[in-house]
């Protein structure tokens, strides 16, 4: 029973492989195409890849000892080398249909489609004749032709994102710069105000010391002395009467006109 199951499993795997080989259509630009198409769009028969002394990795590009159309360099469609009218070797694109089960959103752009009757400059490239390659460099690798994908990769590189840590460090540095600037400004104004206060206190102290150290003559006022002498004379004048003087009648406020005391 297990032998029958194993045989059925092998048979199903073989059928799947056969169907994948028979499937002669491409998806996208046909880099994974492994069909048996041997003619180009112009009807020319492809040359064998080994006869051109080209070295490609068969496991990745599908190039080997055959003349089937392949796309080892990422071109728009599968292609192969053919012999020109003058004996030169040139590259031509193959006319292979697109798989019908492909999603419409993944269909190639219109500018990438290749007409079946004409050949553009990108599809046809002239190379040296195959017999011009020296036999001693049979295994030498030839640089593949750059396609659309290689041209896109050579564009400007995207700037590296600093990330959250980079932005945090930038904000931290800006805050430090702002704090330093504010501290320097406040320190300048504080020192300036303290110097002005010291100058004012010094002026007040100098004026006070100058007033204290003045001589006594600076406080002498002749007018003030004259007034003081007059006052002293007036208050110090004796009120003595001579024996010849008699009090005037009625001059004493305690005496009445009749001479009666208390009147």
Curated annotation (Swiss-Prot):
Pfam families: Kringle. It is a single-pass type I membrane protein. It is found in: Cell membrane. PROSITE patterns: KRINGLE_1, KRINGLE_2. Its main location: membrane. The chain crosses the membrane at residues 164-184. One of its GO terms (cellular component) is extracellular space. Coiled coil: none annotated. One of its GO terms (biological process) is negative regulation of phosphatidylinositol 3-kinase/protein kinase B signal transduction. Residues 185-263 are cytoplasmic. Residues 239-263 are annotated as: Disordered. Keywords: Cell membrane, Disulfide bond, Glycoprotein, Kringle, Membrane, Signal, Transmembrane, Transmembrane helix. Residues 24-99 form the Kringle domain. Disulfide bonds join 25-99, 46-80, 69-94. Residues 19-163 are extracellular. Negative regulator of hepatic phosphatidylinositol 3-kinase (PI3K) activity. PANTHER family: PHOSPHOINOSITIDE-3-KINASE-INTERACTING PROTEIN 1 (PTHR24261:SF16), PLASMINOGEN-RELATED (PTHR24261). This is Phosphoinositide-3-kinase-interacting protein 1.
